Regions:
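A short, conserved structural fragment
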Residues: 127-138, 347-348, 377
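Short, amphipathic alpha-helical interaction segments positioned at domain boundaries
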Residues: 140-177
């Protein structure tokens, strides 16, 4: 793995509302991080995975990594197998294969045959790499391996010193295989795992704004918070939207800080990050349940891995909010700002040069409202409280 980023002197003027001034150099290339919500440029990656030509011996070396890919529902994906191979040694792969169902150190030692000292070293390494997690109950710690592709994606690509080869493999996977994976697992999902949560700007009279509809209420009710970089933008590099904007909540914040992939933030800083993201036109995405206690993602249109499944027709992956945008046509100036900001092609200008919303396409994010110069757009409640599961 490359060494940790080297601090450099950045060009003047690279500051923002959140503060900080950093610049990083990584390998032969160079990218800059704009303060505490950084930006990185796009770059080209291979359009396909180069096939190994080393014969049967090299192919057999991939076998435990293929088994791990199969275990997280990505059987047949050589890219996911390569990601496991890049990150985990053969001994570490052995521990991962033994860590399902969740197991104590003693159980892992029995399954793998590793001595306690070596096993502890492997566990620490796997934890730092984002491949192994733990839970504690009644004073007993149990370790479990990464459970699915999105978790593998977020946990392995979040570190600032993630190897470039890893990021390129992830970009190749999300560009080529990810929508099909989402289609395959959709049939087994009891409910959509994530949903859009609206910005807090303007709601029509009579609309009920409940705590789980309000991203600021999520922040206010959090025990603790941390911020990490957006793995999707770190991988795809297709835009210059803010980078350090994924807000981890409660246990996810504990994990990010313990691992060193995130930094603790105050509620005020979290709210400032959200405000900046709304100005930038990013969509808030959270867990699809009433108690949001994991993460608040702030997603762009071009890099985020949440949108390709939606475009591919996967209905039970990400759900809209309980609201739909409505336009007061008497106030609309026909400037077209909302059509440019909408991710979902849900707004168009009519022949009379006023905006019209397609409710079947609208995800109820409210991004269109933030920059409306005449305040012609508001959100209307169209789905009941029961739309959001417990």
């Amino acid at each position: 793995m490359p060494s940790k980023p080297i601090k450099q002197t950045c060009a003047p003027g690279w500051k923002n509302a959140v503060g900080g001034l950093r610049c990083h150099q990584w390998g032969k290339g160079e990218w800059k991080v704009r303060g505490r919500i950084g930006r990185i440029p796009p770059r080209e990656v291979p359009q396909r995975l180069e096939q190994d030509s080393g014969g049967g011996e090299e192919m057999s070396q991939l076998d435990p990594y293929r088994e791990l890919a199969e275990a997280i529902g990505a059987g047949g994906s050589e890219i996911i197998a390569k990601i496991f191979q890049l990150l985990a040694t053969e001994d570490e792969a052995k521990v991962l294969l033994a860590a399902s169902p969740p197991a104590t150190m003693e159980q892992l030692a029995q399954k793998t045959g590793f001595a306690e000292e070596k096993l502890l070293e492997l566990i620490r390494s796997l934890f730092q790499k984002g491949l192994l997690f733990y839970s504690e109950k009644a004073g007993v710690r149990r370790y479990y391996r990464v459970r699915h592709v999105p978790q593998l994606h977020d946990a392995t690509a979040v570190a600032e010193d993630a190897p470039r080869e890893l990021l390129d493999l992830w970009r190749l996977y999300t560009d080529t295989e990810w929508p099909n994976y989402a289609k395959k697992v959709e049939a087994f999902l009891p409910q959509a795992p994530i949903r859009v949560i609206p910005v807090n700007v303007s709601f029509q009279g009579g609309s009920r704004i409940l705590a789980f509809d309000d991203v600021r209420s999520v922040v206010d009710g959090a025990r603790n918070l941390a911020v990490t970089r957006c793995t999707c933008r770190a991988i795809a590099r297709r835009c210059d939207k803010p980078l350090e904007v994924c807000i981890q909540v409660n246990r996810a914040a504990d994990y990010a800080v313990e691992r060193g992939t995130g930094r603790p933030i105050s509620k005020d800083e979290a709210l400032e990050i959200l405000r900046r993201c709304e100005e930038e036109g990013l969509v808030h995405v959270v867990d699809n349940r009433k108690e949001v206690d994991h993460v608040i993602c702030n997603c762009c249109k071009c890099c985020c891995m949440n949108w390709p499944p939606l475009k591919a027709g996967v209905k039970r992956f990400i759900l809209p909010s309980r609201f739909v945008a409505r336009v007061d046509q008497s106030l609309c100036s026909g400037c077209g700002t909302c059509t440019q900001r909408c991710f979902f092609d849900a707004i168009e200008l009519t022949d009379g040069e006023v905006a019209k919303v397609d409710p079947d396409k609208c995800m109820g994010c409210g991004v269109c409202m933030v920059k409306c110069p005449t305040e012609a757009i508001s959100l209307e409640e169209v789905r009941s409280e029961d739309f959001i599961p417990q």
